C-alpha cells in the first residue's frame, strides 16, 4: 500500500474542512434553534439499527441504499441509516408514544450505498422535521412554511416550490382497476413524462373513456397555479379523492402566498417521487444554480403501523452540506493574538475575552507562524501594566 492509498477516501465519502465546517455548524445551530422556536423537540436516532425496523414501510428504494452488516453479538442483520425519517417514525410510535401531535426534529449524518443521481455524496448530513398525529392540512402547511423559512435562514434567495399530490394518481389508477403489470408500466411512463407511451398504455388498458382522458392529461398538468383551474375541468368527473387533493394544493398555494414567503409556486400533478412511501401532498424546493432540490418532503401517513401505532405524519428533510454551500464563506479573520508570555494579567485578560465570546489564540513558545496566518486581526498588547486589544499593525 502506497502513502497515497492511505489518504484516499471511498467514492462519495467526503471530509469537511474549515471554513466550510464552521459554516455547517453555524447553520446547524441556527436551524435547530428555528425548529425549537416552532415547538419541535430534538431527537438523535442511532446510526445503526436492525434491518427489520430500519426498512419497515419504506419500499425497495431505501433497501438498495442501505449499507448492511452483521451484528457480532446477535448474528442479526443490521443497516446503517440511509434516511432518518423511518427512524423518527419508529421513535414516535414505539419510544415516545405521545397521544397528541408530536413535533420532532433532527440533524445527523446518514450513509448511502449508492450516490444520489443528482449529488455525488454518499454521506449527507440530514436535517429536518417530522410532525406526527395530525391528519389535517394545517400540519402540511406548517411544515412547508417551516421548510421555506429554514431556506431563508440558510441564505437562499429566489426559491421555486414544486407541489404535487400522490392522491391524484392513486385515485385515478384505483378507479381504472389496472393489473399490477399495467400499473407499473404506466407509472414508469408517467415518471419519464413519456406522453406517447402514456397515451398508448392508457388507450390499451383502460376501458372507461372518461378515465382515459384523465390519465392521458395527468402528466401534462404542470406549471403555475393556473394548472389547478385546468385540472378541475379535466377531472370534473373524477373520484372525490381527486378533487379533495386539488383543494389541498389550492390551500397550500394560498398559504405560501398569504404568508409572504419568498417562493414561486410550481405544480406538477404527476409528481410521483416516493410513491410507495408518501400518501398525500409532496413538495420540493429548488434554488437557481442547483440541479437538485434543497428541501424535500410530504405526507406519509401510517408509517408507524408496523410498530403498533398508525399515525398521520408529514415532514421534510434537507442536506446540511448542500445548504452550507448557498453562502460562500471565506476564511474567518476575527481572532485576537496573544503572545507566549508569562507577564502578570495576561491569563486573566485572555480568559475574560474568551468568556465574552471572543476567539483568542495564544502563541506557543518558539512558534514561527504569526497572527496573520492564524487568521487574527487584533492583538493583546501590554501598556502601563494593562492588557489591551489593539488592531494588528
UniProtKB/Swiss-Prot annotation:
Gene3D superfamilies documented for this protein: Bira Bifunctional Protein, Domain 2
Organism of provenance: Chromohalobacter salexigens (strain ATCC BAA-138 / DSM 3043 / CIP 106854 / NCIMB 13768 / 1H11)
Protein name (database record): ATP phosphoribosyltransferase regulatory subunit
Location within or outside the cell: Cytoplasm
Cellular component GO terms held in the UniProt record: cytoplasm
Any one biological process term the GO annotation gives: L-histidine biosynthetic process
Pfam families (alphabetical): tRNA-synt_His
Record's signal peptide: none
Subunit relationships: Heteromultimer composed of HisG and HisZ subunits.
Family according to the record: Belongs to the class-II aminoacyl-tRNA synthetase family. HisZ subfamily.
Keywords: Amino-acid biosynthesis, Cytoplasm, Histidine biosynthesis
The protein's annotated pathway: Amino-acid biosynthesis; L-histidine biosynthesis; L-histidine from 5-phospho-alpha-D-ribose 1-diphosphate: step 1/9
Comment field (misc): This function is generally fulfilled by the C-terminal part of HisG, which is missing in some bacteria such as this one.
Entries under PANTHER family matching the protein: HISTIDINE--TRNA LIGASE, HISTIDYL-TRNA SYNTHETASE
Function statement: Required for the first step of histidine biosynthesis. May allow the feedback regulation of ATP phosphoribosyltransferase activity by histidine.
Amino acid at each position: 500500500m502506497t502513502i497515497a492509498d492511505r489518504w484516499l477516501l471511498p467514492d462519495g465519502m467526503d471530509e469537511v474542512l474549515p471554513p466550510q465546517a464552521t459554516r455547517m455548524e453555524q447553520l446547524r445551530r441556527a436551524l435547530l434553534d428555528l425548529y425549537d422556536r416552532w415547538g419541535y423537540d430534538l431527537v438523535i436516532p442511532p446510526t445503526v439499527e436492525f434491518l427489520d425496523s430500519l426498512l419497515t414501510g419504506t419500499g425497495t428504494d431505501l433497501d438498495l441504499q442501505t449499507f448492511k452488516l452483521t451484528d457480532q453479538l446477535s448474528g442479526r442483520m443490521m443497516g446503517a441509516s440511509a434516511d432518518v425519517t423511518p427512524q423518527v417514525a419508529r421513535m414516535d410510535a414505539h419510544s415516545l408514544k405521545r397521544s397528541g401531535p408530536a413535533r420532532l426534529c433532527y440533524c445527523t449524518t446518514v450513509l448511502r450505498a449508492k450516490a444520489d443521481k443528482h449529488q455525488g455524496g454518499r454521506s449527507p448530513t440530514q436535517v429536518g422535521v417530522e410532525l406526527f398525529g395530525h391528519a389535517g392540512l394545517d400540519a402540511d402547511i406548517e411544515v412547508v412554511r417551516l421548510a421555506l423559512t429554514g431556506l431563508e435562514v440558510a441564505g437562499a434567495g429566489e426559491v421555486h416550490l414544486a407541489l404535487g399530490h400522490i392522491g391524484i394518481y392513486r385515485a385515478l389508477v384505483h378507479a381504472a382497476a389496472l393489473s399490477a403489470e399495467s400499473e407499473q408500466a404506466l407509472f414508469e411512463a408517467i415518471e419519464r413524462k413519456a406522453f406517447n407511451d402514456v397515451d398508448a398504455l392508457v388507450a390499451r388498458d383502460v376501458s372507461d373513456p372518461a378515465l382515459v382522458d384523465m390519465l392521458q392529461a395527468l402528466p401534462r398538468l404542470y406549471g403555475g397555479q393556473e394548472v389547478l383551474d385546468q385540472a378541475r375541468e379535466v377531472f370534473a368527473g373524477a373520484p372525490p379523492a381527486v378533487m379533495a387533493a386539488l383543494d389541498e394544493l389550492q390551500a397550500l398555494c394560498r398559504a405560501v402566498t398569504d404568508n409572504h414567503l419568498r417562493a414561486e409556486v410550481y405544480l406538477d400533478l404527476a409528481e410521483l417521487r416516493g410513491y410507495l412511501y408518501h400518501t398525500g401532498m409532496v413538495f420540493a424546493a429548488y434554488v437557481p444554480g442547483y440541479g437538485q432540490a434543497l428541501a424535500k418532503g410530504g405526507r406519509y401517513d401510517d408509517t408507524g403501523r408496523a410498530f403498533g401505532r398508525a399515525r398521520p405524519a408529514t415532514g421534510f428533510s434537507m442536506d446540511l452540506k448542500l445548504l452550507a454551500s448557498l453562502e460562500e464563506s471565506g476564511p474567518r479573520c476575527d481572532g485576537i493574538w496573544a503572545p507566549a508570555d508569562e507577564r502578570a494579567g495576561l491569563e486573566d485578560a485572555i480568559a475574560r475575552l474568551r468568556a465574552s465570546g471572543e476567539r483568542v489564540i495564544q502563541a506557543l513558545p518558539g512558534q514561527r507562524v504569526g497572527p496573520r496566518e492564524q487568521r487574527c486581526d487584533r492583538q493583546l498588547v501590554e501598556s502601563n501594566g494593562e492588557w489591551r486589544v489593539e488592531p494588528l499593525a
